[in-house]
Regions:
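Walker A/P-loop phosphate-binding motif and the immediately C-terminal alpha-helix
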Residues: 75-112, 227, 231
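Conserved Switch II/interswitch segment of TRAFAC-class P-loop GTPases
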Residues: 180-189, 194, 205-226
Length: 315
């Protein structure tokens, strides 16, 4: 049995199955493994197991482990709005969770650099991401997705006063992080049509955009501007979501429409885009979101509204 065969026999079964090459020279054992589909934690565990298995082998003074992986074909879905306060971040978080519930491998980028909301919405406040080889590793959540947000990188409550290029660089670090096997990245963009949006379009080229608006005319005017930005950037608009659509009184059951009804659907039809559905103005959605538990992770009509949206986006 050769030295290499002897060393191979010492490797854990998973490492043997993933082994690309193994070489012993001058006391250094160099192991190259296929880490396709593994996230950062799984790669770290495998590397530690290999080093432990070979460290005491005769003639081995040093163990070097290199990981190779096929870069996954990742689909970026940008979630935008022309106006703040329309529930875009809530829709982004719940869309990501709903896609994960449908069996997709999903990551969520909080690209609202100046006003990050995802740590609160996903219950990750106070949790900082790790880093590996100058790449950030997403913060895991209880809901089957990883998330990266400036809210996890700065002190809570601290204001960020950066010019456009710095915000664009920050976006790049979030998008180009170690997303492991994620096949879909949902990107929660800031409101408006500024530097971060332009950087997203020019450097990262989303596969499509979901536009969030309330039914009222003022919000729809700005939502139309957001759609025009994506069209100019040659990013397909997947469709328009009408948020805060219809309020059911918890006492009498009467349905009212404080922001109007049907405006987003009519605007989508006018512009030739798909209408992706309505999300109700529901106290339960607000309460769950403030508590860091996305309604899409639960059951009932609130969850079903987001699951229906995810089914339309996933097709």
């Amino acid at each position: 049995m050769s030295d290499n065969d002897a060393l191979k026999s010492l490797l854990p079964p998973l490492a043997q199955a993933r082994l690309q090459s193994l070489r012993l020279a001058d006391g250094a054992a160099t192991v190259i493994l296929d880490a396709s589909g593994f996230d950062g934690i799984e790669r770290d565990r495998l590397e530690a197991a290999v080093k432990e298995a070979l460290a005491a082998a005769p003639g081995v003074r040093e163990v070097r482990v290199a990981m190779m992986a096929d870069k996954p074909k990742r689909r970026i879905i940008a979630v935008g709005s022309g106006k703040g306060g329309v529930g875009k971040s809530t829709v982004s978080a719940n869309l990501a969770v709903a896609l994960a519930r449908l069996g997709r491998k999903v990551g969520l980028v909080d690209a609202d650099i100046y006003g990050p909301s995802q740590p609160r919405l996903l219950g990750t406040e106070g949790k900082r991401p790790d880093a590996r080889e100058k790449q950030l590793i997403p913060v895991p959540t209880e809901f089957g997705i990883g998330v990266l947000s400036m809210g996890n990188l700065i002190e809570p409550g601290k204001a960020i006063a950066w010019r456009g290029p710095m915000a664009g660089n920050a976006l790049g670090q979030l998008v180009d992080a170690d997303w492991g096997a994620a096949e879909i990245l949902v990107v929660d963009l800031p409101p408006g049509t500024g530097d971060v949006q332009l950087t997203m379009l020019q450097r990262h080229k989303p596969a499509g955009a979901v536009i969030v608006s309330t039914p009222q005319d003022l919000a729809l005017i700005d939502a139309t501007r957001a759609m025009q930005l994506f069209e100019v950037g040659q990013v397909p608009v997947i469709g328009l979501v009408e948020n805060m659509a219809g309020y059911v009184c918890p006492h009498c059951g009467e349905v009212s429409d404080p922001f109007g009804r049907g405006g987003a659907e009519a605007e989508a039809a006018r512009l030739g885009h798909a209408f992706l559905g309505r999300i109700p103005l529901d106290m339960a959605i607000r309460q769950a979101s403030d508590a860091g538990v996305p309604p899409a992770a639960g059951e009932g009509p609130q969850a079903e509204a987001f699951l229906a949206l995810a089914r339309r986006v996933a097709t």
